[in-house]
Design a protein with these regions (language model features):
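Amphipathic alpha-helical packing segments from all-alpha helical-bundle domains
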Residues: 64-73, 80-106, 259-264, 277-302, ...
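Hydrophobic/aromatic-rich alpha-helical bundle segments in the mid-to-C-terminal region
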Residues: 86, 90, 105-168, 280, ...
Length: 347
């Protein structure tokens, strides 16, 4: 059962969530100690070696650690929506950040990269679980990691940027048919889809039920089930409406509220896609577009002009920071995000 279902369907289960987070913190610390044992006899690490280590840690999230990766993503997102979960977020982040700090504390060159790696990993982890079996995705992730860890002032080669864009296109291609299916709908079904989307934006995907939507829309349950035959159809109808809204909001880079919704819903789409593969194209496209939307703003601040991989990598790191730090984080579109981005790029 997901964290969202615990929160919405079971009720206030603070003690249960506290126990879940405590267990995840123990797992994080155990994995940190295992990695430190692996690295203890290594005299030094360069950035290429750090890239390899981060990729391996993410691969482990796909395999034996996938349950923990999903739980952590859900805790962070639910805490972003529910201030009552803030203490759990703070505790989880302390151990999550401590994992990377513990790995690299003995390596001066790697130590300065810990913050950007930790933030990037927050954004990346659930997508590695969702898409980690895809060759194109794994290659894209490796390209992004190299760009994230490249020293400031070390421009990426044009061939590397072309390769990165090629991988993005390869990954987006198979999703196109499904995205084209999210065409505009009209009439009663469109009104209901907007109600579903409003509920998702407010409470998250896990909160959606036939009874809730029928009540908020003021229609009989039979009317709702006529247009949406199953719970999956109900969710997909709301997702398609949110997707259309997101496409419109991405034309307004300064819209902080829209940016927050995209941040939350992109991760919720990835989590939802782990249960229903029909959501996967939306998760892929939302994630791609959120980085493309702020490329012009991000690139000059991170030595990434003409380098899509680097601007995408730092966008991911900044989004990870916003998720990890809650209201203290600076998401793309906020007034303080240029300063924060420059700080990350100087590590």
């Amino acid at each position: 059962m997901s964290v969202g279902k615990i929160r919405y369907q079971i009720g206030d289960k603070a003690a249960l969530l506290e126990a879940v987070v405590a267990r995840e913190c123990e797992i994080i610390d155990l994995r940190r100690d295992q990695w430190r044992t692996q690295l203890v006899s290594c005299p030094e690490l360069d950035r290429a070696s750090v890239t390899d280590i981060v990729a391996q840690v993410l691969d482990e999230a796909v395999d034996a650690g996938h349950v923990s990766a999903i739980v952590m993503a859900e805790i962070y997102i639910q805490a972003y929506r529910d201030p009552a979960l803030e203490p759990l977020r703070v505790r989880l982040w302390a151990h999550d950040h401590g994992f990377w700090r513990g790995l690299f504390e003995g390596f001066p060159e790697a130590r300065g990269l810990v913050r950007r790696i930790a933030y990037y990993s927050i954004d990346e982890r659930v997508f590695s679980v969702l898409l980690g079996q895809s060759r194109d995705y794994r290659l894209l992730r490796q390209s992004t990691l190299r760009a994230l860890l490249r020293p400031a002032g070390a421009q990426g080669r044009s061939a590397a940027s072309a390769w990165h864009l090629h991988l993005i296109a390869q990954l987006a291609g198979p999703a196109q048919a499904a995205l084209e299916g999210a065409s505009e709908i009209k009439g009663t079904k469109a009104v209901l889809a907007r109600q579903i989307a409003d509920a998702m934006a407010r409470d998250g995907v896990e909160a959606i039920s036939f009874r809730q939507i029928a009540t908020s829309a003021g229609v009989p349950l039979s009317t709702l089930t006529h247009h949406f035959l199953s719970h999956r159809d109900l969710v997909l109808g709301g997702v398609e409406e949110l997707y259309r809204r997101m496409r419109a909001s991405l034309g307004r880079p300064g819209d902080a509220r829209a940016g927050r919704q995209v941040l939350l819903l992109t991760h919720e789409m990835a989590l939802g896609a782990l249960r229903d593969s029909r959501l996967t194209p939306f998760a892929i496209d939302m994630r791609r577009r959120r980085a493309e939307n702020v490329h012009a703003q991000v690139a000059p601040l991170v030595d990434g002009e003409g380098d899509r991989a680097r601007s995408q990598a730092f966008t991911m790191a900044l989004i990870g920071e916003a998720i990890a730090l809650g209201e203290q984080g600076q998401q793309p579109g906020s007034a303080a995000f240029p300063v924060r981005l420059c700080e990350l790029a100087r590590d």
